[in-house]
Amino acid sequence: MLKFTGNCLIVPWDFSEMALAALKTSVAMVDDRAKIKVIHVGQIPTSTEPTVIWDTITEQSIQEYASKSFQKTVADHPELSGLELVTLFGDPGFAITDYAQEIAAELIVISSHGRRGLSRLFMGSVAERVVRLAQVPVLVLRGPAD
């Protein structure tokens, strides 16, 4: 396993098994877990017609849900202890790369879900966008193809 000798790396967190693999890989790459910044990018749903459900989804509720879910994951995987989650909002590609620049991160470790064909066309690829936008190296961990 390669060792990361820089000061800071970012791991985007989307609650998936692949994101968990990226976290575990990052932990194995560093000597000091404080170098790892785990981020989740939340998006508030938009609708042309406001409804009751949209009123209950706020940045605070997204942040609380992400924090609780991440804490549960850390509790289930002791090797991740000491990691903390930062929640950002906006377009995931821009939010991840802007935050990397803001905190002078030297590496982004991101998972890719392995989408192909129409699934990739319609859902896009955050990992691909991060690779295109990032000013720092990006390590992409590929998942199995759908």
Language model features with spans:
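Gly/Ser-rich helix-loop-strand patches that form or flank binding pockets
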Residues: 1, 99-146
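Small/aliphatic-rich secondary-structure junction motif
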Residues: 2-52
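Short conserved AdoMet
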Residues: 30-31, 78, 135
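General small-molecule cofactor/ligand-binding pocket signal
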Residues: 37-39, 83-88, 139
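A short acidic, glycine-rich active-site loop
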Residues: 55-68
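Short beta->alpha linker loops
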Residues: 65, 87-91, 113
